[in-house]
């Protein structure tokens, strides 16, 4: 990564204000991570449809009076989720789910504010300019698009006869968050101090594959969450007694393409298989880096990533066996983003040297 023509080494030796850009980008990544965890809690507590309107500005204020709470509750009562799932819910219970969704949206507003203020400050101070400024601005625009995607996802759960958001739109929402998080970490990492380590192209390609498979695994995990596939087939290593379920189970839904979204057998099977593939590729990459780049920070990063993936796999298996209790579901989602962050930082550091 260059800063309007500066090399990574020159960035490190540039004035202190330039290094504040790196700290700010890592702060943005931490906020996105927090947003993902709060979003996971919002989903797991069934709170995502409690606010039935999208009002980016005025929606920042929660109900402040009994009358305002009653009005918000009546709006929730008008959607199918209340009538088909939560009929008879008390106002206190509604407030519980409302606060989760409101907090999720409020955190999104805070992220936008921190990004906007930080971007303006760094541009005015001269720390951000040229291609780097344009690139970072693009990340901000992705964040704005993410807010719109979030509302499209919520709106998919407000339709008649529907009690939850569409799995494919949940996948899009989480994958966009993962993409923004990845790019923030990669840009910030590449602005760090070079270590003088030269990575072969084969190592860089393998690290890219690990990063891609991690993103894919998160996307497939979102489909598991959206289709509630984690609440069924709660056994491991077998799925309903099969290592590989028969075709009549994997493709029981018509048309064929819908099996990849709505068939809980295939959705969970895909998530399992991609996890095995990710672990295998990470192990191979760890061996590769150990052979080609021994006694380097790259070797340490690749090894750490393997162990993080192993821990995440164990958490995933336990989460499945216990049918996704709240705390385990949150831990599994948070751990996935820790793995992703490590994979992104590792890949970016290989470019930095």
PLM region spans:
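Polytopic transmembrane helical bundles with strong interfacial aromatic enrichment
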Residues: 2-353
